[in-house]
């Protein structure tokens, strides 16, 4: 089988930087899928992406589809010809569908008789004839939320398309994609190298782009270059660059030939909280801040230019000039905000609506204050500090700094609280109330902060569910899924002795008559328990394990987690499968029971197997009670695993539905006790 390398490049206007990597990887995945569906073998598909291009390269792509042997069975010979030996309509219709005459059909002898059959070999198409359609479909299926048209064209894409290049080895593929004729023309850098040049082979692409067009098309190569140079520049300044993965990807998506440079700002700006300065540098300017070895912000930053002049002074000064007004604004807002205490901003919260039916932000802070105090009392935190932090929790939303730099909410509250002389735990809680902000984010460190964070999240969950506005589909305007998962993480990972029903009930009481959903407690608890599924699945825990625990509906998250860990461990034991099947059988038997089931009477047992099981379940019931009380579910299930042999023996040797009612009742009681032992942890009958 002969192969060639295949290249496809789509040259565009500047693509959205935050979406570039996703578009490129999706393009490659789509091409892989299309090649597989076409039956075309290949070694691998590589992807390339720069601000003005998406490209894929399929290495070792077969030059043709493989031939296919087909065999279409027709009617039986007895039904294919009439008494005169002429083909019947059924035979003629089948032959016509195969593109042959009845006389051309072969015969297939089977033990059930003889049949007409059509055998043929369908030659595979040359790969080059399929490539235009493969790329067109791959582009059509990209995850593009908003498409656009350009010029007088009817085609749509994420940005206007100017060039399309498809090479299969050294052959330029003819055709049109997105209204653009395929050509051997590739566009270079906007300002460096050749603006436009031609290539003659798929393997020339990367080298020609770099040498002629001054473009590094390999996204990962540009990313690695930016990272290495940034770290090198930061080290030269005696610091460490703050390079977040998402920002690094975005910066990589903004440049075709990266030039990493450093610039500085006036040291007087360091009097402003570092978070505000960093917000401006990262969010607005896409700069990388630099910190010293003690974690203090340095008056320098790293930026990446898309041009590479011999003297970069003008570029450096230009970036310093651009960032200076933003830092000056931050300095002004900070100094202005310090003139008023956080507590004095409480009345202004009355002018901001949290939700029309649920009142203002001032109403919300009053509820957070009360609920945070309740939670603090339960988890051993300082109640007064939790209430104080709850009261001040939203005051920084009324400051100039947070109004201008919204992502600094919480952290600015912490700085202003410190300036006001608030207790340190109170100040820190104002920042940590929003944790975790995203999946994998750190949790609040102090119990006071945990109290406020949970109070805030439960207030939102209870309030929104209480007015019947639960999330639907992907719509979740109040981020309830994040609030639920964040709450669960705090309770579980901090091992807090909190009950969801209790928290929702207390939260609901604080709304007075504002809530209209009478089932708010059950609705919120069910919603939160449902979030466990996604959490544990991400950890690789089997769905049936989660379902087994959900069936018991434990409402204390730390307890729920302990049960999941225990069942996940139990599932690995040799006896697990047999005991799960036995529990399923027990459930079915008990569901059909036609007598009242009481306590086990050991003296009423007749068969040795039922005596053995009765003794085992009664003994274990006593033995595991202390473990259940302490939540040591793994130890409980380890002990219950010993029931496999007596359970198997019972079902092999004992008829449960005996004719004697007393005997039947006692045997059902044994099974009921057996089931009850496991149900104290989970419904293991649901394990697959």
Curated annotation (Swiss-Prot):
Annotated catalysed reactions: tRNA(Gly) + glycine + ATP = glycyl-tRNA(Gly) + AMP + diphosphate
GO cellular component, one term: cytosol
Record's signal peptide: none
Keyword Ligase: yes
GO molecular-function term, one example from the UniProt record: ATP binding
Recorded superkingdom: Bacteria
EC number(s) reported in the record: 6.1.1.14
Keyword Lipoprotein: no
Coiled-coil annotated spans: none
Keywords: Aminoacyl-tRNA synthetase, ATP-binding, Cytoplasm, Ligase, Nucleotide-binding, Protein biosynthesis
GO biological process: arginyl-tRNA aminoacylation; glycyl-tRNA aminoacylation
PROSITE patterns: AA_TRNA_LIGASE_II_GLYAB
Family note: Belongs to the class-II aminoacyl-tRNA synthetase family.
Subunit comment: Tetramer of two alpha and two beta subunits.
NCBIfam families reported for this sequence: glyS
Protein name listed in UniProt: Glycine--tRNA ligase beta subunit
Organism: Actinobacillus pleuropneumoniae serotype 7 (strain AP76)
Gene giving rise to this polypeptide: glyS
């Amino acid at each position: 089988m002969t192969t060639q390398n295949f290249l496809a490049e789509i040259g565009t206007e500047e693509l959205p930087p935050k979406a570039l990597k996703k578009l490129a990887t999706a393009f490659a995945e789509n091409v892989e899928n299309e090649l597989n569906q076409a039956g075309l073998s290949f070694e691998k598909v590589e992807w390339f992406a720069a601000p003005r291009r998406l490209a894929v390269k399929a290495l070792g792509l077969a030059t043709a589809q493989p031939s296919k042997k087909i065999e279409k069975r027709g009617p039986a010979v007895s039904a294919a010809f009439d008494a005169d030996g002429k083909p019947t309509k059924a035979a003629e219709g089948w032959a016509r569908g195969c593109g042959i005459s009845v006389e051309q059909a072969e015969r297939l002898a089977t033990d059930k008789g003889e049949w007409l059959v059509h055998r043929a070999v369908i030659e595979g198409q040359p790969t080059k004839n399929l490539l235009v359609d493969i790329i067109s479909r791959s582009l059509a299926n990209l995850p593009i939320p908003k498409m656009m048209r350009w010029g007088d064209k009817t085609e749509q894409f994420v940005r206007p398309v100017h060039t399309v290049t498809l090479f299969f080895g050294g052959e330029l593929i003819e055709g049109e994609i997105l209204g653009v004729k395929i050509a051997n023309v590739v566009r270079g850098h906007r300002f460096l190298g050749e603006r436009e040049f031609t290539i003659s082979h798929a393997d020339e692409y990367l080298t020609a782009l770099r040498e002629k067009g001054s473009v590094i098309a390999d996204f990962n190569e540009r990313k690695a270059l930016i990272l290495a140079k940034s770290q090198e520049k930061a080290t030269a300044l005696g610091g460490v660059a703050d390079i977040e993965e998402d920002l690094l990807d975005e910066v990589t998506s903004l440049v075709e030939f990266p030039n990493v440079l450093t610039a500085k700002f006036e040291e007087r700006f360091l009097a402003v909280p570092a978070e505000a300065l960093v917000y401006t540098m990262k969010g607005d300017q896409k700069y990388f801040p630099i910190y010293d070895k003690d974690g203090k912000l340095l008056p320098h930053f790293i930026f990446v230019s898309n041009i590479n002049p011999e003297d970069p002074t003008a570029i450096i000064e230009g970036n310093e000039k651009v960032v200076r007004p933003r830092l000056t604004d931050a300095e002004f807002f900070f100094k202005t905000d310090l003139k008023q205490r956080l507590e004095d901003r409480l009345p202004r919260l009355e002018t901001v609506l949290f939700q029309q039916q649920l009142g203002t932000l001032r109403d919300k802070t009053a509820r957070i204050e009360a609920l945070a105090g309740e939670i603090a009392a339960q988890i051993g935190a300082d109640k007064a500090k939790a209430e104080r932090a709850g009261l001040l929790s939203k005051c920084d939303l009324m400051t100039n700094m947070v109004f201008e730099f919204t992502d600094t909410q919480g952290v600015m509250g912490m700085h202003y609280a410190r300036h006001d002389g608030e207790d340190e735990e109170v100040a820190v809680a104002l920042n940590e109330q929003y944790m975790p902000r995203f999946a994998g984010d750190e949790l609040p460190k102090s119990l006071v902060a945990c109290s406020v964070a949970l109070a805030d999240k439960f207030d939102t969950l209870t309030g929104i569910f209480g007015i019947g506005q639960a999330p639907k589909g992907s719509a979740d305007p109040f981020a309830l899924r994040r609030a639920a998962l964040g709450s669960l993480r705090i309770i579980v990972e901090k091992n807090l002795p909190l009950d969801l029903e209790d928290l929702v009930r207390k939260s609901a009481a604080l709304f007075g008559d504002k809530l209209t959903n009478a089932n708010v407690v059950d609705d919120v608890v069910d919603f939160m328990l449902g979030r466990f599924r996604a959490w544990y699945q991400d950890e690789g825990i089997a769905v049936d394990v989660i379902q087994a625990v959900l069936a018991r509906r434990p409402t204390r998250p730390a307890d729920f987690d302990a049960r999941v860990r225990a069942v996940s461990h139990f599932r690995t034991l040799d006896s697990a499968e047999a005991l799960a099947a036995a529990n399923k059988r027990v459930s079915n038997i008990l569901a059909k029971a036609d007598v009242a089931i009481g306590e086990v009477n050991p003296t009423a047992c007749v068969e040795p197997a039922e005596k053995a099981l009765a003794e085992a379940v009664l003994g274990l019931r006593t033995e595991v009670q202390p473990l259940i009380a302490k939540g040591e579910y793994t130890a409980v299930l380890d002990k219950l695993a010993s029931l496999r042999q007596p359970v198997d023996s019972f079902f092999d040797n004992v008829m449960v539905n005996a004719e004697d009612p007393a005997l039947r009742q006692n045997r059902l009681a044994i099974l009921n006790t057996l089931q009850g032992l496991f149900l104290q942890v989970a419904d293991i009958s649901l394990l697959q």
